[in-house]
Amino acid sequence: MTDTRNGEDNGKLLYCSFCGKSQHEVRKLIAGPSVFICDECVDLCNDIIREEVQEAQAESSGHKLPAPKEIRTILDQYVIGQERAKKVLAVAVYNHYKRLNQRDKKDDIELGKSNILMIGPTGSGKTLLAETLARLLNVPFTIADATTLTEAGYVGEDVENIIQKLLQKCDYDVEKAQMGIVYIDEIDKISRKSDNPSITRDVSGEGVQQALLKLIEGTVASVPPQGGRKHPQQEFLQVDTRNILFICGGAFAGLERVIQNRSARGGIGFNAEVRSQEMGKKVGEAFKEVEPEDLVKFGLIPEFVGRLPVIATLDELDEAALMQILTEPKNALTKQYAKLFEMEGVDLEFRPDALKAVARKALERKTGARGLRSILEGILLDTMYEIPSQQDVSKVVIDESVIDGSSQPLMIYENSEKPAKAAPEA
């Protein structure tokens, strides 16, 4: 092949055989036998080939299902603590996808689907666990908020919208969507308001639970195509939810009291075991004793509880766990902020007493790991505002006094022997 740049071939103007642009409209034109291709079309072809190769590799790697121990090892890299929950999730997810791999083989025994219920305080890692599972298995994943769902025909989101979101994640590939994972958050917020079935419509509570029943158990959902309901003449997509893994999660505030009340009723008479109301001091410890009847007492209907046979309970995060979360995971917050500062050519150092103070503040706010980012964002705001405009800062040090608000981050300059405090923006 010859490389034709700005000259003309025998006095004729040359054109790209693919896009039709002339040699004057592109940077480079490559000549072949009776054809020409420009540099822009070469780049486009490279992108197409790269995407197809990546998809083929992803599909081939998807056939190898990691063992439960391997799944837990990967979860350990992103989620601190919650050892029991990680083991429960690893086994449940492994069995689910093992069941899917066997579904084409003829067998008298049909394996049922085991959806998962995660119970744990706010910021304990429920969403992160579900996200990490989907990422390591390379399957479509979507998050739905149960508080926005209503029964069909009422203002709000229909439960079928969950499947539409899943389809959007995989470019409306129905086959891929049917192997996906759906995480429904705030599931405790759709509990019915009393133990007795309501005679009035509860469109965002018990009504939503009823609507979710078939979807979670397995049904063929009719989902509008990409155009949505604006084009009613288009055929609806039929999505079978039998093989979609549903993970429901919630904080279930107050469930620990239901569990403790049941435990306190241990028995009567001289031989009855005496139990103290103070037994479950920690919410996470109480959650470990949860029974289906407790969830029904809390406000979930029995049929809905029955569709979630695997229960994973998460512990409250203590100060030590929060400090680990700040530094140990692959995507730990301190590593993320250090990377941001590194892009400016500045080192960022967190002293151990600073990490402890951040963990204490998150505990006081009762936000768990979710509150760590907002705390760090607040203390680093002024520094991140100033540093891009300063060329000679080499290091920023954060200690306990910065977290407490009594001083500003310490900024160390390359050409100055005397370190300076970052000045807050007036």
Curated annotation (Swiss-Prot):
One of the Pfam families matching this protein, by short name: zf-C4_ClpX
Keywords: ATP-binding, Chaperone, Metal-binding, Nucleotide-binding, Zinc
GO annotation, biological process: cell division; proteolysis involved in protein catabolic process
Residue stretches making up the ClpX-type ZB domain: 4-57
Positions annotated to bind Zn(2+): 16, 19, 38, 41
Keyword Nucleotide-binding set for record: yes
GO molecular function ontology, one term from the record: ATP binding
Described function: ATP-dependent specificity component of the Clp protease. It directs the protease to specific substrates. Can perform chaperone functions in the absence of ClpP.
Quaternary structure annotation from Swiss-Prot or TrEMBL: Component of the ClpX-ClpP complex. Forms a hexameric ring that, in the presence of ATP, binds to fourteen ClpP subunits assembled into a disk-like structure with a central cavity, resembling the structure of eukaryotic proteasomes.
Name of protein: ATP-dependent Clp protease ATP-binding subunit ClpX
Top-level taxonomy: Bacteria, Pseudomonadati, Pseudomonadota, Gammaproteobacteria, Pseudomonadales
Gene this chain is encoded by: clpX
